[in-house]
Amino acid sequence: MEDNNLVSFDQGWFVIQTYAGYERKVKEDLLERAELYNMADKILRVEIPTETIRTEVNGKMKEVEENLFPGYVLVEMNMTDEAWFIVRNTPNVTGFVGSHGNRSKPTPLFEQEIQDILVGMGKVVREIDFDVFVGKRVRIVDGAFSGFEAPITEINGDKLTLTVDMFGRATPVELDMHQIEDIQA
């Protein structure tokens, strides 16, 4: 019986463990090695799950990007012996998550898991299954204004401007499509 929620064993998203703080270096090195060893058709994408945090520094608000999973990097790849070897032997990579040692192949992430991570990062825009138009009231589901309801005042490609009422003032907020949902009547 086949589980349709699983990505094919040969191709999928895998989690590699790295030394904490070396995630960006591992990503750069892995992409370089994929090109160098003609493995770009096997090592397809490398992502570091991050989120943007607003924090106050010296009395000023600043946006800082933080790793969601320090010490881990996501790799979309065709799992061949050669691709496994290139990834596993990249400097600062300590191994694959879901591998049981002795060169055993790791288990890929479930499709829904990777979609949730990528949507959260803004790398994949979830499908909007309702009409989006100027004047429509929607609910914000992601970001600092999550939970607020507001009308759409402008549409520019995949970006929306909503006018959020805060403290009696109309505040324009720019969002991506994946950050809103329809308000059910």
Swiss-Prot record:
Q: Which domain of life is it from?
A: Bacteria
Please provide, in alphabetical order, the Gene Ontology terms of the cellular component aspect for this entry.
cytosol
| PROSITE patterns named in the record | NUSG
The KOW domain covers 134-164
Q: Which Pfam families does the entry link to?
A: KOW, NusG
- InterPro entries per the record? KOW (IPR005824), NGN (IPR047050), NGN-like_dom (IPR006645), NGN_dom_sf (IPR036735), NusG-like (IPR043425), Rib_uL2_dom2 (IPR014722), Transcrpt_antiterm_NusG (IPR001062), Transcrpt_antiterm_NusG_bac_CS (IPR015869)
SMART domains named in the record: KOW, NGN
Q: What's any GO biological process attached to this entry? A: transcription antitermination
Annotated keywords: Transcription, Transcription antitermination, Transcription regulation, Transcription termination
Family (UniProt): Belongs to the NusG family.
State the function annotated in the UniProt record: Participates in transcription elongation, termination and antitermination.
This chain's protein is named Transcription termination/antitermination protein NusG
User: From which source organism is this entry?
Assistant: Lactococcus lactis subsp. lactis (strain IL1403)
Instruction: Supply the source organism's classification.
Output: Bacteria, Bacillati, Bacillota, Bacilli, Lactobacillales
